[in-house]
């Protein structure tokens, strides 16, 4: 599954981010805790150069907490601080300013020693579409400043947002890479809703989701669809789920489109519980 989705405003955002970097003290790279690596844009490291950074693992409530800890240990080994957060209910957000101050202490001490007047921390928030940037900004600013929604690509321009007196945030449109070289990256992004359903083959996504559940959370899969065992053949598994869910057409044939829709919706709405679709070693 080769997916190419790089709207013009994203190319423009990349140029503007590069220009604004000199104003920035620290970068918040927002990722989806369910797919911490697949939801990172490979271009971001190249764009950000050596700016101090915090990895924000958003939607942590939807991710397997055990695997989230593995990811945090992985980033720590790379010398990168990370925080597991939930921008919807505010979990972990109070640590963002505190951690930023710790990371930037030396820089601000040097500025103070040179007689530079104290100012707010300037942070850049960056991430792929639909990872929750606008919701996070609204939470931090305690205002409904940024447009939010479940459709990828809602923010289309950059804006500075004040977070109390201690921080100023520069929001950017979601920057997605031009194409996904690794098919599994595309599937992980699709199954979590990071890219538009209209540009992907949803049946491929449902098959990926089912096989992932079979390998990693088989009991949850069986329980959800009341299966005594999981058929090895994908078509048989679809048939079993379609039958259990009443997705039948005239003549008793399975409605695969409806079955696909149910499987993807069940995954995205946590009917299988919190899931993480990749581990650090993968």
Curated annotation (Swiss-Prot):
Keywords: Cytoplasm, GTP-binding, Hydrolase, Nucleotide-binding, Ribosome biogenesis, RNA-binding. GTP binds at residues 58-61, 86-87, 130-135, 174. The gene is rbgA. The keyword Zinc does not apply. Pfam families: MMR_HSR1. Belongs to the TRAFAC class YlqF/YawG GTPase family. MTG1 subfamily. Its main location: cytoplasm. This is Ribosome biogenesis GTPase A. Essential protein that is required for a late step of 50S ribosomal subunit assembly. Has GTPase activity that is stimulated by interaction with the immature 50S ribosome subunit. Binds to the 23S rRNA. Required for the association of ribosomal proteins rplP and rpmA with the large subunit. PANTHER family: MITOCHONDRIAL RIBOSOME-ASSOCIATED GTPASE 1. One of its GO terms (molecular function) is RNA binding. GO terms for cellular component: cytoplasm. One of its GO terms (biological process) is translation. Interacts with ctc. Interacts with the immature 50S ribosome subunit. 2 molecules of rbgA bind to one 50S subunit. It is found in: Cytoplasm. Residues 14-178 form the CP-type G domain. Gene3D superfamilies: 1.10.1580.10, P-loop containing nucleotide triphosphate hydrolases.
């Amino acid at each position: 599954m080769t997916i190419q989705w790089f709207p013009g405003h994203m190319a423009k955002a990349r140029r503007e981010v590069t220009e604004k970097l000199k104003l920035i003290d620290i970068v918040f790279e927002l990722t989806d805790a369910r797919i911490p690596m697949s939801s990172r844009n490979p271009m971001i490291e190249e764009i950000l150069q050596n700016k101090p950074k915090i990895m924000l693992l958003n939607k942590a409530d939807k991710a397997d907490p055990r695997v989230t800890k593995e990811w945090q240990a992985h980033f720590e080994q790379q010398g990168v601080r990370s925080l597991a957060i939930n921008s919807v209910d505010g979990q972990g957000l109070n640590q963002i300013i505190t951690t930023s101050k710790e990371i930037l202490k030396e820089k601000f001490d040097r500025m103070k020693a040179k007689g530079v007047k104290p100012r707010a921390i300037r942070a850049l928030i960056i991430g792929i579409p639909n990872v929750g940037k606008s919701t996070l900004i609204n939470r931090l600013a305690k205002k409904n400043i940024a447009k939010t929604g479940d459709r990828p690509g809602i923010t289309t321009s950059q804006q500075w947002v004040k977070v109390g007196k201690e921080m100023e945030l520069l929001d950017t449109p979601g920057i997605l890479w031009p194409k996904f070289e690794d098919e599994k990256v595309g599937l992980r992004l699709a199954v979590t809703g990071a890219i538009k359903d209209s540009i992907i083959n949803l049946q491929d996504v449902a098959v990926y989701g089912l096989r992932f559940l079979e390998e990693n959370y088989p009991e949850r899969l069986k329980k959800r669809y009341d299966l005594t065992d999981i058929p090895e053949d994908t078509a048989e598994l679809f048939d079993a789920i379609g039958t259990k869910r009443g997705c039948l057409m005239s003549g008793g044939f399975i409605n695969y489109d409806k079955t696909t829709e149910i499987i993807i919706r069940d995954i995205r709405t946590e009917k299988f519980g919190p899931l993480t679709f990749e581990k650090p070693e993968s």
